[in-house]
């Protein structure tokens, strides 16, 4: 009897450890948001150029990359093209030594999705010194640009605005 219980227990243990094949979860979905990443795409190179122009306080030099009817968001605040151009230029009224890559390289790539959209995405650490607070500021940033015909038609910037808002309040 002991041998029978041992045999049944052993079989249950062995078969309970065998993975169950589940085609729904093991199938790779080749859906709309699947696609290919390319860190050497033209859009990646243009985004690098844009980020360099920003850090050099020469953002208007890349104005040609931005669609006239761009939808631009800084967190949940929406801006038009001129709002974006003048807004980022105002950073230099508030901060010195602005950099996108002082402490670490920029992570940047472009995704060509199966639904036909093209997005460049960057993750980086923005740094600067407050002109009013004198604080050394470091902000983690993610931005994504959707491209059509060589122009940015959507732009999303995500970051914690606390240090920026603090510097604005000290400037006033």
Regions found by a protein language model. Give the residues of each.
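A short, structured loop/turn motif at beta-sheet edges
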Residues: 111-118, 146-153
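Low-complexity, intrinsically disordered terminal/linker segments enriched in charged
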Residues: 26, 153-172
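Sec-dependent N-terminal signal peptides
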Residues: 4-14
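A solvent-exposed, acidic/Ser-Thr-rich amphipathic alpha-helical stretch
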Residues: 58-112, 118
């Amino acid at each position: 009897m002991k041998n029978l219980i041992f045999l049944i227990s052993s079989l249950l243990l062995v078969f309970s450890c065998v993975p169950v094949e589940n085609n729904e979860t093991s199938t790779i979905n080749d859906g709309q948001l699947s696609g290919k990443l390319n860190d050497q795409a033209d859009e990646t190179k243009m985004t690098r150029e844009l980020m360099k122009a920003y850090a050099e306080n020469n953002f208007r030099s890349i104005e040609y990359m931005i669609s006239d009817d761009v939808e631009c968001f800084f967190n949940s605040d929406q801006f038009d093209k001129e709002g974006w151009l003048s807004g980022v230029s105002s950073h230099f009224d508030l901060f010195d030594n602005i950099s996108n890559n002082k402490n670490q390289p920029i992570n940047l790539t472009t995704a060509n999705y199966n639904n036909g959209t093209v997005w460049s995405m960057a993750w980086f650490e923005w740094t600067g010194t407050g002109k009013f607070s004198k604080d050394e500021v470091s902000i983690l940033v993610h931005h994504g640009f959707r491209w059509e015909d060589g122009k940015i038609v959507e732009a999303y910037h995500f970051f914690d605005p606390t240090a920026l808002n603090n510097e604005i309040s000290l400037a006033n």
